[in-house]
C-alpha cells in the first residue's frame, strides 16, 4: 500500500491511498459522519443491505477474476432477513473480495475502492457524497499531491 493521504469532506478527515492505479477511501472515516463512536455498526448496516451486496458483487465480478460467485449468491439470498449480519471481514474472507480491505491496529479500518466508497457515501448522505466526489476530483486534478491536512 502506498502512503496514506487525507482529504477533508464536510469537516471530516477521510484517509485516501492509492494502490497501483486504484484509489481506496476509508469507510471508517466516512462512517464518522453518521456516528463517530460506532463506525463498525454503520458499515455493517450498509453491507447487509441488498443494494450494497449487489453493487459490491457486480464490482467484484467485473474487476476480480478470483471472486467467489457462489458465496456472493448466498449472501445475496440472505439479504433482507432481519437476522442477516455481514461484516467487511466476512465478505472479504468468504468471497475473496478485493474492493474492500479491512486492516486492524493503528492506522487500520475498513477501506474501499473509490467506486464502492462513493456508493457507501450515497447511503451515508447525498450531500456527503457530493462533497466527497468534488474533493476527490480536486486530488486527481492536482496530480494526487496533498499535504498531511488534505490541502493542495
Residue ranges and their predicted role:
Residues 1-152:
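An anion-engaging/catalytic patch
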Amino acid at each position: 500500500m502506498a502512503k496514506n493521504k487525507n482529504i477533508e469532506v464536510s469537516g471530516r478527515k477521510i484517509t485516501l491511498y492509492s494502490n497501483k492505479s486504484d484509489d481506496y477511501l476509508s469507510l471508517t472515516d466516512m462512517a464518522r459522519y453518521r456516528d463517530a463512536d460506532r463506525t463498525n455498526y454503520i458499515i455493517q448496516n450498509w453491507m447487509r443491505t441488498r443494494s450494497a451486496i449487489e453493487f459490491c458483487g457486480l464490482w467484484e465480478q467485473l474487476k476480480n477474476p478470483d471472486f467467489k460467485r457462489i458465496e456472493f449468491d448466498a449472501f445475496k439470498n440472505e439479504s433482507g432477513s432481519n437476522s442477516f449480519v455481514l461484516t467487511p471481514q466476512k465478505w472479504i474472507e468468504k468471497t475473496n473480495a478485493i474492493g474492500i480491505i479491512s486492516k486492524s491496529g493503528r492506522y487500520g479500518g475498513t477501506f474501499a475502492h473509490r467506486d464502492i466508497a462513493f456508493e457507501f457515501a450515497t447511503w451515508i448522505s447525498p450531500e456527503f457524497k457530493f462533497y466527497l466526489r468534488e474533493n476527490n476530483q480536486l486530488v486527481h486534478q492536482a496530480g494526487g499531491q496533498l499535504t498531511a491536512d488534505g490541502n493542495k
